[in-house]
Swiss-Prot record:
PANTHER family: 6,7-DIMETHYL-8-RIBITYLLUMAZINE SYNTHASE (PTHR21058:SF0), 6,7-DIMETHYL-8-RIBITYLLUMAZINE SYNTHASE DMRL SYNTHASE LUMAZINE SYNTHASE (PTHR21058). Catalyzes the formation of 6,7-dimethyl-8-ribityllumazine by condensation of 5-amino-6-(D-ribitylamino)uracil with 3,4-dihydroxy-2-butanone 4-phosphate. This is the penultimate step in the biosynthesis of riboflavin. It comes from Actinobacillus pleuropneumoniae serotype 3 (strain JL03). The lineage of its organism: Bacteria, Pseudomonadati, Pseudomonadota, Gammaproteobacteria, Pasteurellales. GO terms for biological process: riboflavin biosynthetic process. This is 6,7-dimethyl-8-ribityllumazine synthase.
Length: 153
């Protein structure tokens, strides 16, 4: 029985990152964490392109454009949606998640879901580089690993 795993070497890989501007004080930290992790694992900064979109709802469209361009080994999607007093949160979270997942399945390109969906601002801050780690960094690791798993198959 073969065990297929992916290493964490990003040398020679190209990444697209789609980041939402809404809640950018959190998303800037997610983006920095992702880029830092990609570079630490061998990616060349010149092989990392970033696109900014208005909010999490708009991420899937740009992720799909990147995924179908043939330029990227993986696309990382970063954003933050914080629950408010209306149901808007539910719609944005659900559609962003569905859209991002659909892009990966439709294109065969790894598309990593790095949209924080939190109950409050404190939870978002915790996941952007404080006590709960940096989810942008974790998404970058996931992107590297899944690209290498797919190459090994």
């Amino acid at each position: 029985m073969a065990k297929i795993t992916g290493n964490l070497v990003a040398t020679g890989l190209k990444f697209g990152i789609v980041t939402a501007r809404f809640n950018d004080f959190i998303n800037d930290k997610l983006l920095s964490g992702a880029i830092d992790t990609l570079v630490r694992h061998g990616a060349d900064e010149n092989n990392i392109d970033t696109a900014w979109v208005p909010g999490a709802f708009e991420i899937p469209l740009v992720a799909k454009k990147m995924a179908t361009s043939g330029k990227y080994d993986a696309v990382i999607c970063l954003g933050t949606v914080i629950r408010g007093s209306t149901t808007h949160y539910d719609y944005v979270c659900n559609e962003a998640a569905k859209g991002i997942g659909a892009v990966a399945l439709e294109t065969g390109v790894p598309v990593i879901f790095g949209v924080l969906t939190t109950e409050n601002i404190e939870q978002a801050i915790e996941r952007a580089g404080t006590k709960a780690g940096n989810k942008g960094s974790e998404c970058a690791l996931g992107a590297i690993e899944i690209v290498n798993v797919l190459k090994a198959i």
